């Protein structure tokens, strides 16, 4: 059977944007509504041309009285069409009540969890979602009203990992015409008209009002979406460009912002925070922007995550408690927080100190206002380009009566040379070597 104009346009979208490849298994998220029923029928008609297998999945959210009707409808339709369908029920109202989240948010989370699990368990490559251009408009408006950045503008994509949206750039009226022209049955979700749900209010109140200003609202928003996608691609290239300046150090992600402009710094801050599962809000971003010209500072992003700056370095880190002191005695390996030392008879690293008498040697944190030979340790660390957020974690090696070594900062001249019975305290490993080595050539030698 030849393709009609709409089906051909969807095929071109799939081929142009490489959404489906030969041999792919595709799982259609099938609610039974107009959009998902049109998507299922189009993909069934295109499956030979695309050389792919089509499956369907339906989650009964147990929210509406007619949910059973919808479940039975999609099951019966797929059975007649020869399409394997996966159907499950999940008590979304209880799920939302237990977690104190909204119905819309909870239903979406449950649905995506279900779809991803079905795809994984059955070796299915792609999940096809029936979002259209009107959905894109409504979602962007919803995100803008709630406060969003770039991620809110590009909230829906034609392809996002294993999810595809072949109908994303088609208007709802085109889908309605296709359904009517082909006599495709569907079910109507009566909650789509309930204005207590934010998306419905936007659909039935806000969008019609905006169309009085621009009758071609959908295409206007598609241009905004396209611009957002271009900007997002630029940010991805930016992250790749500076990837060698981003370091994962223990419970931190640190990046070097030297010679970066404000836009680049903020995008890297957002990226690194995202790697720590933190989504920065507008207020937090503005706070970071306001402090960019300050040399050192700290901002709490959540109960257990903070962002800190020292010199050109930014650190997004988990808050944790650190060991205060560690005694060093017999030869062997010693762990002081994230630092690893070894007391042995040989020099094994570039950072080391000779120990002439093992008695009373310890590794500890610095003390407030502490001085070495009359010079504040803080000033020494500043001269040595140690970022402020690392200074309290720098190990200080002491004998009974004096500080003999602070790695990368200071070595007592009496402990630079080996004596007959000396042992060597080597710094074998520290998670910040990439940072501490980076500015080594800029350091003033401390003696």
Curated annotation (Swiss-Prot):
It holds the Pfam family ATP_bind_3. It is found in: Cytoplasm. Gene3D superfamilies: HUPs. GO terms for cellular component: cytoplasm. ATP binds at residues 31-36. InterPro entries: Lysidine-tRNA-synth_C (IPR012796), Rossmann-like_a/b/a_fold (IPR014729), TilS/TtcA_N (IPR011063), tRNA_Ile_lys_synt (IPR012094), tRNA_Ile_lys_synt_N (IPR012795). It catalyses: cytidine(34) in tRNA(Ile2) + L-lysine + ATP = lysidine(34) in tRNA(Ile2) + AMP + diphosphate + H(+). The N-terminal region contains the highly conserved SGGXDS motif, predicted to be a P-loop motif involved in ATP binding. GO terms for biological process: tRNA modification. Keywords: ATP-binding, Cytoplasm, Ligase, Nucleotide-binding, tRNA processing. CDD domains: TilS_N. It comes from Pseudothermotoga lettingae (strain ATCC BAA-301 / DSM 14385 / NBRC 107922 / TMO) (Thermotoga lettingae). It is an enzyme of class 6 (ligase). Ligates lysine onto the cytidine present at position 34 of the AUA codon-specific tRNA(Ile) that contains the anticodon CAU, in an ATP-dependent manner. Cytidine is converted to lysidine, thus changing the amino acid specificity of the tRNA from methionine to isoleucine. Belongs to the tRNA(Ile)-lysidine synthase family. SMART domains: TilS_C. GO terms for molecular function: ATP binding; tRNA(Ile)-lysidine synthase activity. This is tRNA(Ile)-lysidine synthase. It comes from the Bacteria. Its EC number is 6.3.4.19.
């Amino acid at each position: 059977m030849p393709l009609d104009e709409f089906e051909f346009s969807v095929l071109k979208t799939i081929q142009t944007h490489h959404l489906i490849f030969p041999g792919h298994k595709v799982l259609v998220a099938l609610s039974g509504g107009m959009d998902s029923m049109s998507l299922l029928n189009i993909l069934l008609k295109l499956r030979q041309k695309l050389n792919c297998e089509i499956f369907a999945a339906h989650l009964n959210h147990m929210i509406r009285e007619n949910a059973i009707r919808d479940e039975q409808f999609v099951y019966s339709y797929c059975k007649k069409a020869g399409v394997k369908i996966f159907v499950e029920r999940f008590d979304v109202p209880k799920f939302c009540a237990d977690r104190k989240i909204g119905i819309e948010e909870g239903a979406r989370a449950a649905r995506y969890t279900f779809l991803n699990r079905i795809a994984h368990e059955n070796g299915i490559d792609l999940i096809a979602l029936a979002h259209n251009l009107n959905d894109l408009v409504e979602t962007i408006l919803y995100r803008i009203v709630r406060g969003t950045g770039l991620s809110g503008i590009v909230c829906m994509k034609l392809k996002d990992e294993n999810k595809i949206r072949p109908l994303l750039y088609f208007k709802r009226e085109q889908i309605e015409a296709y359904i009517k022209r082909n006599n495709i049955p569907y079910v109507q979700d009566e909650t789509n008209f309930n204005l207590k749900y934010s998306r419905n209010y936007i659909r039935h109140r806000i969008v019609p009002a905006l169309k009085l200003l621009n009758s071609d609202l959908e295409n206007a928003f598609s241009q905004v979406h396209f611009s957002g996608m271009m900007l997002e691609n630029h940010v991805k290239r930016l992250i790749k460009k500076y990837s060698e300046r981003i370091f994962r150090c223990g419970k931190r992600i640190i990046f070097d912002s030297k010679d970066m402009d404000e836009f680049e710094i903020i995008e890297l801050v957002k990226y690194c925070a995202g790697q720590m599962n933190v989504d920065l809000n507008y207020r937090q971003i503005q706070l970071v922007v306001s402090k960019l010209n300050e040399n050192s500072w700290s901002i709490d992003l959540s109960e257990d995550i903070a962002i800190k700056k020292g010199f050109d370095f930014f650190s997004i880190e988990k808050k944790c408690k650190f060991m205060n002191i560690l005694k060093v005695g017999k030869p062997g390996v010693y762990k002081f927080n994230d630092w690893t030392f070894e007391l042995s008879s040989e020099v094994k690293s570039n950072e080391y100190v000779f120990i002439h008498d093992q008695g009373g040697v310890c590794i500890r944190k610095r003390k407030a206002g502490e001085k070495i030979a009359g010079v504040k340790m803080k000033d020494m660390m500043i001269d040595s380009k140690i970022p402020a957020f690392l200074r309290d974690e720098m190990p200080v090696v002491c004998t009974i009566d004096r500080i003999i070594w602070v790695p990368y900062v200071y070595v007592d001249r009496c402990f630079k040379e080996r004596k007959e019975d000396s042992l060597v305290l080597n710094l074998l490993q520290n998670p910040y070597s990439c940072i501490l080595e980076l500015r080594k050539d800029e350091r003033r030698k401390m003696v």
